[in-house]
Amino acid sequence: MDIIHDNAADLSALNGKTVAVIGYGAQGRAQALCMRDSGVNVIIGVRPGKSFDAAAQDGFQVMSVAEAAEKADIIHILLPDESHGAVYEAEIKPHLKAGKTLCCSHGFAYVFNTIVPPADVDVIMVAPKGPGTEVRRVFEEGFGCPGLIAVHQNPSGKARDVALAMAKAEGLTRGGVLECTMAQETYEDLFGEQNVLCGGLVDLMKYGFETLTEAGYPPEMAYFECVHEAKLIVDLIYNGGIQKMNSVISNTAEFGEYYNGPQILPAEVKERMKESLKRIESGKFAKDWLEEAAKGAPNLKAKREALGQHPVEIVGAKIRSLFERN
């Protein structure tokens, strides 16, 4: 994949256009502030509450979602995946017309059809590959967070230019942008979260902690070894790759990686990952999650509560307090 930088993007594609950022959480705030700093006319659509007040305090023109959708040329929806469909149907769809653009930072709603846009509307994705706080921080430092763009519908013939312009306005083309499809971004994002970054890593940490504590080892030490020090390893990989990480750790640690890693995560794990990918690509995961969310997410809430009572969290709070500055 080619990496796209500033010289391939032109902010003039946004001249005379109003961008409505729908939602003002971490991503909404960061992207809105960066675009405004780049000279883009940005308004905020959000319901009354803390986010409404925060956007107003940041100096934005804030209004209802419906009003913002009516006024904007580009409607950038940055809400939780499970709420996109309802908000779109009630407050955005009535104000769409030919020539407008729908934008998102994650393709879930379009890939799994909770939003089915009219054919005469452009649909694009501009997705920073980092949390909102990081997007804003590196922008203010004069650099940019890498990102993705996608063109899902392009009746105007100008959708790609607009996506690149928005990416540039957010600083993403400074860091480097990759062009993909919404399906690629959605499937890969969900797969990474469920199998490696969240589902895989968290369960691996918990099993390691439980194994040591059940064998009689002090829980504080178990937390250090199985949870706390993960950041040290991930930072090394983040900055230099796996091979660089292996060159920094001890020979004993590296030998242990090759010696025991395949015993803990045998090839069968990869087969399970393939099944997970099939559940994502088929839409089964999305169906299950949307049904859960529609019920008020009782299972999700129960899992959250149970995790809060797990010894790894209780001990973790104790360990983290050691690093707090008084």
From Swiss-Prot:
| Pathway membership | Amino-acid biosynthesis; L-isoleucine biosynthesis; L-isoleucine from 2-oxobutanoate: step 2/4; Amino-acid biosynthesis; L-valine biosynthesis; L-valine from pyruvate: step 2/4
Query: What catalytic reaction does the record list?
Result: (2R)-2,3-dihydroxy-3-methylbutanoate + NADP(+) = (2S)-2-acetolactate + NADPH + H(+); (2R,3R)-2,3-dihydroxy-3-methylpentanoate + NADP(+) = (S)-2-ethyl-2-hydroxy-3-oxobutanoate + NADPH + H(+)
Single GO molecular-function term? magnesium ion binding
| Amino acids binding Mg(2+) 1 | 189, 193
The cofactors required by this protein are:
Mg(2+)
Top-tier EC class: oxidoreductase
Q: What is this protein called?
A: Ketol-acid reductoisomerase (NADP(+))
In which organism is this protein found? Akkermansia muciniphila (strain ATCC BAA-835 / DSM 22959 / JCM 33894 / BCRC 81048 / CCUG 64013 / CIP 107961 / Muc)
Where along this sequence does the record place binding of substrate?
250
Gene behind this protein: ilvC
Q: Which residues form the active site?
A: 106
Q: Which residues bind Mg(2+) 2?
A: 189, 225, 229
| Residues in KARI N-terminal Rossmann domain copies | 1-180
- All copies of the KARI C-terminal knotted domain together span 181-326
**Positions with a binding annotation for NADP(+):** 24-27, 47, 51, 132
Q: Which InterPro entries does the entry link to?
A: 6-PGluconate_DH-like_C_sf, KARI, KARI_C, KARI_N, KARI_prok, NAD(P)-bd_dom_sf
A matching Pfam family: KARI_N
Q: Per the record, GO CC terms?
A: cytosol
NCBIfam families per the UniProt record, alphabetical: ilvC (TIGR00465), PRK05479.1 (NF004017)
